[in-house]
């Protein structure tokens, strides 16, 4: 990790968020003498960033209206494409823990085994990642078969959100060490 979190700064950041449900697990880890995973530790170096992450998470992931399985598919697809070790490995563990797939990497790569809805979402995501200025009307039309306008907005935001987290983790050398393994 390229950023070295300071213990006192971490404790203060998490104490300020002690009542927040999203950080319940992290606060339990701290009480037990354990540390939070590196992404949260890194974000806690700026309490503003940690609060922003919390707000986005509450509304988009794990919050939001899209099915959790679809969210994990989107997260894994972006994370693999962006070579984000933290997000890829942690969401492989999360996907296994939720019982979504025993082989999450195949879950993403074997697209012909996915339903039409998931295939449309991944095609849209791939188009955004390739060049967000060139998403075709055909891709949008295919998406509209399965998603409402509101869901398309949420899906687009989720795609941007996970890409931002991938870039954050990659740039700062944040690594996953199995903290979320089932």
Task: Outline where the language-model segments fall.
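Secretory/endomembrane lumenal or extracellular ectodomains immediately following the signal peptide
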Residues: 1-65, 182
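Short acidic alpha-helix initiation/capping motifs at coil-to-helix transition points
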Residues: 30, 48-53, 83-87, 129-137
